[in-house]
């Protein structure tokens, strides 16, 4: 009996594959994805029943939508009221105590029990304030004036970026990057696609190599980035650009998975980009596609015919074989990902590449990702700006406007932007100039600030600031066995109890290269080398980007360094340490100051930052802080056993002669990994 694939049936009845897969599962027809097969009988069932079932779906959608609207109305009508005190950050411990009517020592004690050391004048962090709100029954409010803290340019940019979509969303073309090992045929495949499918074949003209090109297949456009390889891809991602929708991984059938193949896999996975495998050079006598598929399984790329979900296409760039199927799979993945854009919005997108042309000045190739870009528009492009004087597409044709996912060269910028910079249309050139100038000043300030790159030395501080508990690592070694041993040892450090996660995002054989540095920048990773040295370019790039790169000769030393850094990621524990005992021998009441206790240190010592317990008849009657510690008329930091001193407690005067002060502090215990 003849069988048909899900995506073929979807095309036949005018549905998207994703929608049909859902429908089939609702009909109890066993399918996994768009490549699953259906019997002729099952296909006929779908053809007959789909119209009826889709009509039911529409009715259900209307009912659900109506119910949701009603629920939202109910919520709006209900509203919420509260009698609890309202507290708005920023606020100090002392201010909070006064506002909610409790002793500051009570707040400090609660914070210490949570592992936060604080004093009366210290500003409370957001998580500490939320914790105290639960303990003391008040409400933390976020005040509106925070808006005023944002700069004018930030508000304008945010407003433009969060523009409400205009009109209906339209399906857009996918953006594809071709990756793989050197000499496996990345450029040959790109050339083969361009020769047979380029848009200029349909309309005439000469292809202009502007950094990206469009091809036409099945009356739909696909955009290919012209610079093959993962280096350019990762360099753009390091600058925050996420242009690529699909990665084509080229593997030579006669050579198999090689070091740069593994790099490309890890780069694509790190970016969360779907991978289509193109097994090239299948026309060669020693081609062995099955060996390639077997090797790919080691990197969790299992082809569909072997029960996985990785699309794999056999091609020969030289003989133009498999190109159609490759493009069909690209369009299928794009359809499953439901790529859309809003042409009526103002233009925004990403710089693909830029250069200084002697005759034309700064020239940038941009990819319009959303909205429409027009000649005469004022644009902000990274930290530069300009008024678009002219636009040229990949066929050399001058355009008056560029629609979504159209690569164009633009002229009229003040300076050369960098690949990966975002661009967006702004209301006028004056505004663009002002925003660009302020962004340039901000960039200069940021360069003077501390590096944002993660390192084993500052890992704990950065994790505390970012409230994350992950460590990304790139491993390079001299031989495969050492690399795998180091990788496995690092992964064993994952501590689920404390939610610490070590991610080895790439492990490869060979020297540390510039490509590794760019991946580290993009993924905020550290690099560990075992018995290998970085090449000169990598060393310079690591210094420039301030990437923590460490080289070891003993695996144990690498593991110990990472363990030490991870120990800093764990929430610290504290133990109480008693410093000394002090006896109150005389009291002096001073107006406007309080009761000063004349004391004698009977054991240990007392410091001016010690916490104090007041003990009377064996019972603790007060816990608090020292306001003043004196020897005669002088303020002192510490008084040792056998000496007298004067002590003024903070907000506590109910003392009696014979009371005992117990001085104590808290010490942090570094947890074991």
Swiss-Prot record:
GO terms for molecular function: GTP binding; GTPase activity; translation initiation factor activity. This is Translation initiation factor IF-2. Residues 32-90 are annotated as: Disordered. It is found in: Cytoplasm. It comes from Natranaerobius thermophilus (strain ATCC BAA-1301 / DSM 18059 / JW/NM-WN-LF). Residues 171-340 form the tr-type G domain. Residues 44-78 have a biased composition (Basic and acidic residues). Belongs to the TRAFAC class translation factor GTPase superfamily. Classic translation factor GTPase family. IF-2 subfamily. Residues 226-229 are annotated as: G3. Residues 180-187 are annotated as: G1. GO terms for cellular component: cytosol. Residues 316-318 are annotated as: G5. One of the essential components for the initiation of protein synthesis. Protects formylmethionyl-tRNA from spontaneous hydrolysis and promotes its binding to the 30S ribosomal subunits. Also involved in the hydrolysis of GTP during the formation of the 70S ribosomal complex. Residues 280-283 are annotated as: G4. The keyword Protein biosynthesis applies. Keywords: Cytoplasm, GTP-binding, Initiation factor, Nucleotide-binding, Protein biosynthesis. Pfam families: EF-G_D2, GTP_EFTU, GTP_EFTU_D2, IF-2, IF2_N. GTP binds at residues 180-187, 226-230, 280-283. Residues 205-209 are annotated as: G2. Its main location: cytoplasm.
């Amino acid at each position: 009996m003849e069988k048909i694939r899900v995506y073929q049936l979807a095309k036949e009845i005018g549905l998207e594959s994703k929608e049909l897969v859902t429908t089939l599962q609702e009909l109890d027809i066993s399918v996994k994805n768009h490549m699953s097969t259906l019997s002729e009988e099952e296909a006929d069932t779908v053809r007959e029943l789909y119209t009826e079932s889709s009509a039911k779906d529409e009715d259900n959608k209307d009912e659900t939508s109506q119910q949701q609207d009603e629920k939202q109305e109910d919520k709006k009508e209900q509203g919420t009221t509260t009698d609890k005190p309202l507290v708005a950050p920023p606020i100090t411990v002392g201010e909070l105590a006064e506002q909610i009517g409790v002793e500051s020592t009570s707040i400090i004690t609660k914070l210490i029990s949570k592992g936060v050391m604080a004093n009366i004048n210290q500003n409370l962090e957001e998580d500490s304030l939320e914790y105290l709100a639960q303990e003391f029954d008040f409400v933390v409010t976020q005040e509106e004036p925070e808006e005023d803290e944002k700069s004018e340019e930030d508000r304008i940019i945010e407003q433009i970026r969060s523009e409400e979509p205009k009109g209906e969303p339209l399906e857009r073309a996918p953006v594809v990057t071709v990756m793989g090992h050197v000499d496996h045929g990345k450029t040959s495949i790109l050339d083969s696609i361009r020769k047979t499918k380029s848009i200029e074949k349909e309309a005439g003209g000469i292809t202009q190599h502007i950094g990206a090109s469009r091809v036409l297949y099945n009356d739909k456009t696909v955009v290919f980035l012209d610079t093959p390889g993962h280096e350019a891809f990762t360099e753009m991602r390091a600058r925050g650009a996420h242009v690529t929708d699909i990665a084509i991984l080229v593997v030579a059938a006669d050579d198999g998975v090689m070091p740069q193949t593994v790099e490309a896999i890890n780069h694509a996975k790190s970016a969360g980009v779907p991978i289509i495998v193109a097994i090239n050079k299948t026309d060669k006598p020693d081609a062995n596609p099955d060996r390639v598929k077997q090797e790919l399984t080691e990197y969790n790329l299992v082809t569909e015919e072997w029960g996985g979900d990785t699309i794999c296409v056999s091609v020969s760039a030289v003989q133009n074989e498999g190109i159609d199927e490759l493009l069909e799979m690209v369009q299928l993945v794009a359809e499953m990902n439901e790529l859309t854009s809003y042409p009526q919005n103002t233009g925004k997108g990403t710089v693909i590449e830029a250069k200084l042309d002697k005759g034309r000045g700064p020239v940038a190739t941009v990819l319009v990702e959303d909205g429409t870009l027009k000649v005469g528009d004022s644009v902000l492009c990274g930290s530069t700006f300009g008024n678009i004087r002219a636009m040229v597409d990949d066929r050399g044709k001058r355009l008056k406007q560029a629609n979504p996912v159209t690569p164009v060269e633009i002229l009229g910028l003040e300076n050369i932007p960098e690949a990966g910079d975002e661009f967006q249309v702004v209301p006028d050139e004056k505004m663009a100039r002002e925003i660009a100038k302020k962004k340039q000043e901000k960039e200069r300030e940021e360069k003077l600030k501390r590096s944002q790159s993660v390192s084993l030395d500052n890992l704990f501080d950065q994790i505390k600031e970012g409230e994350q508990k992950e460590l990304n690592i790139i491993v390079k070694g001299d031989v495969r066995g050492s690399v795998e041993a180091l990788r496995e040892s690092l992964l064993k450090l994952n501590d689920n109890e404390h939610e610490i996660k070590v991610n080895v995002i790439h492990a490869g054989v060979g020297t540390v290269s510039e490509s590794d540095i760019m991946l580290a920048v993009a993924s905020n990773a550290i690099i560990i080398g075992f018995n290998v040295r970085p090449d000169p370019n990598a060393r310079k790039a690591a210094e420039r980007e301030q990437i923590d790169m460490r080289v070891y000769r003993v695996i144990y030393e690498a593991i110990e360094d990472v363990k030490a850094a991870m120990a800093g990621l764990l929430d610290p524990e504290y133990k109480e340490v008693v410093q000394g005992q002090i006896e109150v021998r005389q009291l002096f009441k001073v107006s406007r100051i309080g009761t000063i206790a004349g004391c004698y240190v009977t054991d240990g010592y007392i410091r001016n930052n010690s916490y104090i317990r007041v003990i009377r008849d064996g019972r603790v009657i007060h816990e608090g802080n020292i306001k003043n510690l004196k020897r005669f008329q002088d303020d002192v930091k510490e008084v040792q056993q056998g000496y007298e001193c004067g002590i003024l407690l903070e907000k506590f005067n109910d003392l009696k002669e014979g009371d005992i002060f117990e001085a104590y502090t808290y010490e942090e215990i570094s947890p074991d990994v």
